[in-house]
Amino acid sequence: MNLQNPKDRKLVHNRNIHCMGYIRKDGDFDIEAVLTDSKTYDFPSDTHGIVKKNTPYHHMRVRITVDVNLRVKEAHAMTISGPYQICPKGAENFKNLIGIKIGPGWKRRVQERIGGPSGCTHITELTGPLATTAYQTIGGEISRQRRRGIEANNLPEINQENNLKNSCIAYSEAVSYTHLTLPTKRIV
């Protein structure tokens, strides 16, 4: 299915964000995200000469390790490619995410700890997709393990309905979401 037919146009910019969720042997979860920006044409750069078309001029990679309660235990970031020589320094404060929990207030706490003039806009932007990927990874893994009859990492009983209430139109109190079958022993 496509969006409505667009006007005649030409692609000039690509931004790709790719997220991955892993369960570790120790029961924690690694959540990774990669961001790349590229142009569909060659262009001059003050620090890199001519940047060839489809070559990432922004290329950032981040990883957080979270426990089943979504608390950040490890945080790593790197700038593989940035437009300025100082750009890799913006990844250094990513470790300041250690100790905070993904949940209500996540974006505000992230901004306070790694945003602004000592951080990297693009690395900070990746923390939104990291959070939703963590929810999907952990919730999916808990559900998968329970379907297989495996004790899912000794997780506490969590009511999914309370976690999702009013988070989107499907879970809106204004629209009865009783049509959804909600597992009662999942995090997501």
State where each predicted segment sits.
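N-terminal "first-domain core" detector
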Residues: M1-I23, E32-A33
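Active-site- and interface-proximal helix/loop "cap" or "latch" segments in soluble metabolic
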Residues: N14, G21-I23, L35-Y177
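Conserved small/polar residues in nucleotide/adenosyl-binding loops
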Residues: T178-T184
